[in-house]
Amino acid sequence: MYELTGKVAIVTGAAAGLGQAIAATFAKQGAKVVPTDRPGVSMDETIEMCKKAGVEEVYTHDLDVTDQDSIAKAIADVKEKYGSIDILASNAGLNRPMPLDQVTPEVWDSVMNVNLRGAFFMAQAVAPVMKAQGKGRIIFTSSQAGLVARENQQPYCASKG
């Protein structure tokens, strides 16, 4: 098992669900967790879970994975605060279930922008930091939806496959 004590871990999409669980698990294992989510989304529950897991300080950051300026700012701020970034858990995801005949180009693009482009641009932004450090881990959250079609989830399934 990879030792997490003292490691700096950015978790995207951490306000709820799997991202929240990842952040709390990393915190329990001693990581310096940086839970992130879209601006305006409450991180209070995630902060509480991380503190219950044993960390004293939880540094959260607003981060819109569809905005490269937001990504660059988050990476720079975390690097400035902690001096390194050891782990990126790229978990942010969007699903907009609806019948196929109702999926507009805007719906399709919104899902792809978060699930594909966001994951790619996060990795692209953090990779130079990790390369300069000579170490780092990038973890992408996938889904069985990428392997098994689900009714009314065409864009999501395509983005996870």
Whereabouts are the PLM-identified features?
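Conserved glycine-rich cofactor-binding loop
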Residues: 8, 15-17
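Conserved glycine-rich Rossmann-like NAD(P)H-binding loop of the short-chain dehydrogenase/reductase
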Residues: 29-45
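The beta1-alpha1 cofactor-binding region of Rossmann-like NAD(H)/NADP(H)-dependent oxidoreductases
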Residues: 40-41, 62-73, 105
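Substrate-binding pocket helix/loop in short-chain dehydrogenase/reductase
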Residues: 99-100, 107-109
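Active-site loop immediately N-terminal to the catalytic Tyr-X3-Lys motif
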Residues: 101, 148-154
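Active-site helix of classical SDR
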Residues: 123, 159
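Residue(s) in the substrate-gating loop at a strand-loop-helix junction
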Residues: 143
